UniProtKB/Swiss-Prot annotation:
ATP binds at residues 30-37, 147-150, 176, 184-187. Pathway: Cofactor biosynthesis; (R)-pantothenate biosynthesis; (R)-pantothenate from (R)-pantoate and beta-alanine: step 1/1. NCBIfam families: cyt_tran_rel (TIGR00125), panC (TIGR00018). This is Pantothenate synthetase. It comes from Listeria welshimeri serovar 6b (strain ATCC 35897 / DSM 20650 / CCUG 15529 / CIP 8149 / NCTC 11857 / SLCC 5334 / V8). The gene is panC. Belongs to the pantothenate synthetase family. One of its GO terms (cellular component) is cytosol. InterPro entries: Cyt_trans-like, Pantoate_ligase, Pantoate_ligase_C, Rossmann-like_a/b/a_fold.
Amino acid sequence: MLIIRNKQALKEAILKETQVNKTIGFVPTMGFLHEGHMTLVKHARKENDVVVMSVFVNPTQFGPNEDFDAYPRDEAHDAKLAEEGGVDILFVPSVEEIYPVELATKLHVIKRVSVLDGADREGHFDGVVTVLTKLFHLVNPNNAYFGQKDAQQVAVVSGLVEDYFFPVNLRIISTVRETDGLAKSSRNVYLTDKERKEAPVIHAALQLGRQLIESGETDETKIVQMMTDKINEQTAHEKIAYLALYAYPDFTPVTDWSKGIIIAAAVKYSKARLIDNELINVKRR
């Protein structure tokens, strides 16, 4: 496995592969890898000749009240997992490598971000599309891999790819979970033992919402209240940041219950904010 920190070296390494018609699969991450990331790598390995992974904690997607410096990092651990998983090129740039000068232009997301994380974390998705635009240009992948757990991000990135004609196929992979249903996340390490035992109720509540909708329930207030009650009864969280359902991928109010719907939750614990979702009537790519 090649570990590359320099943009030019990355482009040269990838050009060497594409000149002999090899396909490139790309897994962008912020590091502190876990089984969820490695599932993306597994799919990329199966579907491409060359697998490129980036590990970059992107400062532009952190808000003023979010601690960029405290985000967990472990490069040695990440490199070990990446190599064991079959990554060919690991791109680990510095902030200065990706943002060498102050940006003269800025991407701004105007749709699919007025609710959920888009509303809760102002400017977050602007940072996401900015760094992905840079990375897509550097890697020029045939396929890029994202997890369903970040469903709003997936919808935003799909819009980016469609709007700016990026020649990349987005591959969306189902959320990887612990045996008790908790979605795998780098932030799970911040949960106390008690919080960790209780946190799987988030997924259980979302499944309840799915069951209600699939059984014909269309009273949105009732669905959300039943899910809220389930979470409040079974876990001592700090607050529910959001628990809602929307049409997917547009994140507008549901008007047709036979089309794509997302039920999404964000629950704040003492030192961790966990997100999860269920997609209904959505065909995965």
